[in-house]
Amino acid sequence: STVDRYNDDIHYKNGTHLSAQLSWAGTMLAYQSRTPDIDLVGDQWKDMWLERLEGQPFFMEEWLAHQRRDDFWKHGSICEDFGGFPVPALVIAGWADGYRNTPLKAIEGLGDKGKAIVGPWIHKYPHFAWPKPRMDFHAEAIAWWKRWLDDADNGAEQLPQMRAYILDGPRPTLRRENDPGYWIAKKDWEKPQTQMLTVAADGTLNATGASEGTGDIYLRSPLDTGTSGGEWFTLKPDAEIAGDQRSDNGGSLTFQTGPLAEEAIYLGAPELTVDVTCEGDWENLAVRIIDVHPDGTETRACYGVLNLAHRDGNETPTNMPRGEKTCITMQLDAMGYRFAPGHRIKLALSTSYWPTILPSPQAPGLTIDTASIRLALPLLGDHERITVAEPENPNPLPQYEMRSPEETRRSVEKDLVTGLTHYRIYEDTGLEVHPQNGLRTQEIRNEDWSIDPNDPLSMKGDIDWNIRIERDGWSVSTKTTTTMRCTNKDWIIAASVTAFEGDREIFAKSFEQRIPRDFM
């Protein structure tokens, strides 16, 4: 869920263009193309399907027509008027999910009407989500609804305003099954006190107040910087979660503390202030806060991105004043994280975070005044340790019979002949049989993002889906394609839907549109 459809949803983030927007548009194009089940609707299935196919939209056309915060996004954003939202709300999210900011923003806006829970999870319900530990979501939800829908006297209104799982140095792995950490509660949520980190003359990140810095540094990250960032929208605890950050640091400007003498625990949204100079109209800035383990392994604790044309707000973006030093303040995503003694805190700045965000059309880079860097980290403050009940059933999902195996592939390829970097995703659900109704389905997604590290206009995104649905004596399928290209002035998007009854094509439709870039 989100309280802010523009900044905390799958489309845009602080004025940057999320690649997840095209991915989700391609996903929805494929999902909408699926046929009705012949066993449920009978002989009218084909007429219903053709009507559905004829009428289905390509959502990217509408989303890309609203690149700034306008009424289209305000309409579904309760942050526009929290006072007009009278309903008590229990808001739940996970640190590994793109919607991690929602619980904190909700309780800050709703006050006593809001309660928040943030676990370690991806974008799944907490009773079957990864990474573990899980939470008994059913018990939490039922108690909440009984209190507010059935007037049950169960004390739900007395719940702590914030319950959060503090991540305790999880290591990047091929699959994040379990994240170390512990649950805390804060009875009342207040704006956290902060610890201020600055850059010393020797380049170290420190909390002493010394901010001599190392001078002005020009930063223009290779445009393929960011391939260890995982997905904005996480559905699996594998490479969709950010991996070891060292591979992205080569294209970044980094500063780190010495080994910590004592633990440092944070809960909330960090804030970075920095003076930058831009020789172009605008540029993107990505910021990562990293936990450096004693052996050098690096875990991303949180990150944030900003299109500098949106530095003063998302409704009326403006060009940067060329050649003039400009003070930028940006809020990063929320985190709940413990840096252990002996670990280091690293700050990484880059002008690219691909493929998570798409590059600006000029990609001019930025000159960073390192003496101006101020990183405000939100301290955990007063709290109590708590336990959170886990679900009684550790494996609640139905078990599907597999007629063909599932497969996932994800890779980064640097082509030394063309100079392109490819980020490729292949997912095949396998042919599975629904345990209750016997419907057989298979979904295959093939996604390819590519870019020349020196040319922002070389960016391409290609997404293909193949969906197969069958019963004995009945087989239908759809193939969808979704693409994005760009010029200095336009986004170029295209899509197609083709439907088959057996091997025979019975429907085809295509979309293509050129949409002007709007400070993006």
Residue spans for each PLM region:
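Alpha/beta-hydrolase-fold catalytic nucleophile elbow
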Residues: S1-V3, G119-P120, A348
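Acidic catalytic loop of the alpha/beta-hydrolase fold
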Residues: W95-Y99
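Short, conserved loop/helix-junction motifs that constitute active-site signature segments
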Residues: G83-F85, L110-G111
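C-terminal, loop-rich substrate-recognition/catalytic regions characterized by aromatic stacking residues
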Residues: P131-F500, R504-M520
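Catalytic histidine neighborhood in serine/cysteine hydrolases
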Residues: G111-Y125
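Active-site-adjacent alpha-helix of alpha/beta-hydrolase-fold enzymes
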Residues: N101-K115
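Accessory cap/linker subdomain of secreted extracellular hydrolases
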Residues: T2-G84
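Short beta-strand/loop motif that positions the catalytic acidic residue
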Residues: F85, V91-A93
